[in-house]
């Protein structure tokens, strides 16, 4: 293989021939995420190409993701379906875990949507395949819990393939009330009942995510958007969105039923498959590539989700295979030369209690502040008046995934210069050891 990657010696899964476990020749890097790298690989015995995901054991253990890895392996072995990425085999060495997976060459569905919304007939084909895969998983007691366009790949014939089962749950994970209780999923696609953390039906939560995906395919932008995470959660909780005028009445009706914030009245997967919009037959043959997107017009610009160059560069065809990349929110905690941002947000793998302790530590500097706290909120307030009254800083903690929380810190009252000084002399030093940073595996 051209550009083949040498493999470590036999103590780490290689052999004297430089092959992984004597069978696989590693080629070019396809992508990487927080915990894994994905390489093109070839089985020299069969000549078959695969996507080889390489996960560092040390990183997995460090952030407590051993169970998540085991779960992903179990789920992918259980769900064999034409629209689900297949796991061929799993190998391990002293320091790494190797997943030999189906090589999906068509890239991410996200890349198509990024160019503009899809025609309804095109979106329908993808949505039919998505629902087929999701229904298959649910019939085997498996809930994906992180469905989004970045987790949907396309093969060379344009058929959809669902990937990334790292957050999946089994029926046996249900508590006595018959509900799941772990907050999982990427914020913009998370169902309102998941945000509330009061227990939820995994099948209904997956259908909400399918509704968001369908909206994105048809509209070209997210139904729930806000620069402020708290405000976005409020919109999700209320089901506060508007369908664009170009959607057909049947499509609008289905999206609205999928994005019902009440899980008890949300449409079921059986009724989705029986809906007029869903049942309409595709015009293309099985092997005909899906048609192109619709270029977004100027009047649509206000609705689009604009991504920075750096964000776009991370969204390669295999980045989402690398174990929950969506939760590496990479702290929005950058330095500013002259002043602090009024609002900061960062991710951490520490529990909420550790975050609260660090915030209390910041408040103790100089004995100038009082602290009020709950399980998910901290308010730091100055004991004495400043130039514009007492300085008040609020922090709110959101559980986004089992191993990660998002912390939002903002000035609630007082003088900006005093807030800047508090951030640089007390808040930053207290928080610097807890916010999450990542390096490729």
Swiss-Prot record:
Q: Provide the reaction this enzyme catalyses.
A: L-seryl-[protein] + ATP = O-phospho-L-seryl-[protein] + ADP + H(+); L-threonyl-[protein] + ATP = O-phospho-L-threonyl-[protein] + ADP + H(+)
Protein's recorded name: CBL-interacting serine/threonine-protein kinase 6
Q: Source species, please?
A: Arabidopsis thaliana (Mouse-ear cress)
Any idea where the Protein kinase domain is? 24-278
Q: Which residues carry this modification: Phosphoserine?
A: 168
Required cofactor names: Mn(2+)
Top-level EC class: transferase
Q: Which PROSITE patterns match?
A: NAF, PROTEIN_KINASE_ATP, PROTEIN_KINASE_DOM, PROTEIN_KINASE_ST
Query: What InterPro entries does its record include?
Result: Kinase-like_dom_sf, NAF/FISL_domain, NAF_dom, Prot_kinase_dom, Protein_kinase_ATP_BS, Ser/Thr_kinase_AS
Which SUPFAM superfamilies does the entry mention? Answer: Protein kinase-like (PK-like)
Q: Which SMART domains does this entry report, sorted A to Z?
A: S_TKc (SM00220)
Span list, region PPI: 341-371
The segment(s) forming the NAF domain are 310-334
Show the Pfam families listed in the entry: NAF, Pkinase
Subunit (UniProt): Part of a K(+)-channel calcium-sensing kinase/phosphatase complex composed by a calcium sensor CBL (CBL1, CBL2, CBL3 or CBL9), a kinase CIPK (CIPK6, CIPK16 or CIPK23), a phosphatase PP2C (AIP1) and a K(+)-channel (AKT1). Interacts with AKT1, AKT2,CBL1, CBL2, CBL3, CBL4/SOS3 and CBL9.
